[in-house]
A protein has these predicted regions:
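An alpha-helix initiation/capping motif
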Residues: 45-47, 145, 181, 332-335
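Hydrophobic alpha-helical segments
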Residues: 158-161, 165, 190-197, 318, ...
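A generic structural signal for nonpolar/aromatic side chains embedded in well-ordered alpha-helices
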Residues: 30, 154-155, 191, 334
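Metallocofactor- and cofactor-centric catalytic cores in central/energy metabolism, strongly enriched
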Residues: 133
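Amphipathic alpha-helical
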Residues: 310-338
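Active-site-proximal inter-transmembrane loops
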Residues: 73-80, 139-161, 165-168
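Non-catalytic, topology-defining segments of multipass membrane proteins
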Residues: 1-127, 171-314
Length: 338
């Protein structure tokens, strides 16, 4: 409902001084250009220290980029109050918040206001945008460095589950595993129960069926829908094979980290070390290159249905003929996605 939507717009202005269009645009650009030089706040590019301690400054600098606002700010509110109050007087919301705190709580209200003013720069701009792309665990092998800082998203609205968010950016629910908790989803469900919100989309749930004898288009659709789950399972397969087949003298921890990344994310010297290690293990080389071939299937958006089916079927046949039991089992797993 418009009233609920407007409440959150008002709350954003009152507690942060941020403009809805700028917030949405910078967030969208971050997802579109993640871990590249165009990412407004990537610790992989700018360094963790820079994003952690200067995240708010990075946000403000990008908010002044008109190209970003025009390209990524589409579909955001553009009514009279947005133009004439929230945007024109963006800094006055936090002053009103200070006044309200002092009126309601007396002198202690100044301390409450100070905590409110520090909360977003430290937790969202610093911790989520910094640590959330540097340290933590990953449920999904998506193309960026996003991590889940903690399995319980309580203090920062569920954004602690940042890898889940990047894997399924349009999902209203950030928790994915049974042991994870997203307090933002808890609030959304309350609003939905009261008829004040509607959940449009959540992350797809993996379902299984007996392995199809041949790949069909429904197989391709299921694999592409669950591609992050597919690549996470493939990463586990690679980790097991690393322990068995990695040549002596090669750093297992370092190699595991590099193999988690796509070739585009690797430096030239890292690529060279990987190739040197793979030259000494035919099985590891096969598993590594088969992963690249698998990702190419859904990266080529111009392929027809028939081409997609053929490419996935060819991959499965190649895996089963490789003589590597783990690849044969993975082919069966792919054909079992429902």
């Amino acid at each position: 409902p418009p009233a609920v939507s407007h409440f959150f717009r008002f709350w954003l202005w009152l507690t942060t001084g941020m403009v809805t269009k700028a917030w949405a645009a910078i967030h969208r650009k971050h997802h579109a250009k993640c871990e590249t030089a165009e990412d407004p706040h990537s610790p992989q590019v700018l360094g963790l220290k820079k994003v952690l301690w200067e995240g708010a400054e990075l946000y403000r600098a990008e908010a002044r980029n008109q190209e970003t606002l025009e390209k990524y700010g589409h579909g955001t509110p553009d009514d009279w109050i947005e133009r004439n109050l929230y945007t024109r007087h963006s800094g006055k919301g936090i002053l009103l918040m200070l006044l309200l705190n002092v009126v309601l709580f007396g002198p202690i209200g100044i301390t409450i206001w100070a905590v409110q003013m520090a909360w977003i720069p430290i937790t969202a701009a610093g911790i989520i945008n910094g640590v959330g792309h540097y340290w933590g665990y990953r449920n999904f092998a998506c193309e960026d460095a996003s991590t889940n800082i903690l399995p319980w998203g309580i203090l920062i609205g569920g954004e602690e589950l940042h890898n889940n968010h990047h894997a399924y950016g349009t999902s209203a629910r950030l928790s994915n595993k049974w042991y994870e908790f997203d307090i933002g989803w808890f609030y959304i469900r309350i609003l939905e129960t009261l008829g004040l919100a509607k959940v449009r989309r959540t992350a797809p749930v993996v379902r299984w069926q007996p392995a199809r004898p041949m790949v069909d288009f429904s197989t391709v659709q299921a694999v592409i829908t669950h591609r992050y789950d597919v690549m996470t399972r493939y990463a586990r397969l690679m980790n097991k094979q690393l322990k068995r087949h990695l040549p002596q003298g090669v750093n297992v921890v370092k190699m595991r980290e590099w193999l988690r990344l796509s070739p585009a994310e690797l430096k030239q010297d890292e690529k060279a070390e990987i190739e040197q290690a793979l030259e000494k293990s035919e099985k590891l080389a096969k598993i590594y290159h088969m992963r690249q071939e698998l990702t190419h299937i859904w990266e080529r958006s111009t392929l027809t249905k028939e081409q997609l089916v053929k490419n996935l079927q060819d991959w499965c046949q190649k895996a089963e003929a490789s003589g590597i039991e783990a690849l044969k089992d993975f082919s069966l797993k792919l054909r079992s996605y429902a």
